[in-house]
Amino acid sequence: MKAVSILSMRIKRGSPHIWVESIATRRAGFEPGVRFSVEMHGSGVLLRVAEDGDRRVSRKIRGESITPVIDINSQSDLAPLSGHESARVVFGDRRIFISPLASELRRRRRLVRLQEHLADGYLETSSIATGGGILSHALHAGFQDAGLYAQSKMCNEIRSDLAEHAMVHNDAFDDQTIMANLPLQELAFDDEVVRRLPEVDIVDLGLPCSGASQAGRSKNKIALPEHHSAVGHLIAPAIALLAKLNPVACVMENVTAYADSASAAILRGYLGDMGYEVHERELLGTEWGELEARRRWFLVAVTKGIPFDFDKLQPGEYPERQLSDVMEHVPLDDSSWSAMQYLKDKEVRDVEAGKGFRMQIYDGSERSIATLTKGIAKRRSTDPFFRH
């Protein structure tokens, strides 16, 4: 290969038209006046220098400069490129190969694979930054409700305790699931491992919110999510792994602030360029029958050509519940009860300092509870507590 470029495709007189004007044309041996043939070759068109070719290289003169030009305007010769706005041109030795963009070929491959899998009644999934696999389980449950079997091909989680717990207790994963228990940034660029990962239909993406959440920014004293030393850069390997998995659709959830991050902007841009349409929505747990008032940002990217409308996602009818309906009975003399005097004292100091931190104390009659954080076991001042 001597050169590669992307050229615009146009319609001229009702047929595809491509104009190749480049010094790379000369490097490939296509000098003005040289004859060449046009052949169908796989997903594209092969131009080959040939003495008996039925086409001839033209020329364009600018002052003393003469540039070879290939001008093809033919429905039959350019049939594989019909309907495309751009084409990839690879210049070789006495040959030029013109084909659809790699992103377009990948989009087509996704759709063909999806049709084949749906015909057999199943889908293949993978999960990135799985955690305990809550999002994976929800997706699989939804597919099952729709009459589709979902097979998890791979899940990636850095924490071994979460990964092993998910493999044992989460029925979204089974013996056919590749457990990639290593950092995402290691997995994405480990050629030996990645080449063994199959392309799938659906990927769920659960990147950590440690840098984007209000608590995370405050704790780590950072201005931007990307400043987080451990997780701020993970959008880069996530995109690299998405490119390998080439899913028909990707589902991501995170704290609402993530939507305004540079990482989210980069992800949107990549998905758009790779042939996806991106849909976003904030959802509140209590509107969907949950007791936890957890508000989250969701991104759903679907391959162009597949309809998707968030407005068709509507809450159902849910029975009214209160916290006491799901609380375990804890004897009043149990050692887990505590006066938490140090937290009460901290609240007094926070009030005096003009800070907004307050304890959240529930008695069980409430119909919702504030977001339960991953560090709730640490008994932090702003996490929910139940009154004795």
Where are the model-predicted features located?
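Core alpha/beta nucleotide-donor-binding catalytic domains of modification enzymes
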Residues: 113-246, 256-262
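Beta-strand-rich non-transmembrane domains
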Residues: 8-13
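Short, well-ordered beta-strand segments enriched in hydrophobic/aromatic residues
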Residues: 18-20, 281
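Short, well-ordered loop/turn elements at secondary-structure boundaries
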Residues: 32, 120, 150, 294, ...
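Short glycine-/small-residue-rich flexible loop motifs, especially phosphate/cofactor-binding loops
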Residues: 22, 136, 268
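C-terminal target-recognition/interaction regions appended to catalytic cores
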Residues: 2-3, 14-16, 23-24, 33-112, ...
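Class I S-adenosyl-L-methionine
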Residues: 191-200, 212-379, 384-388
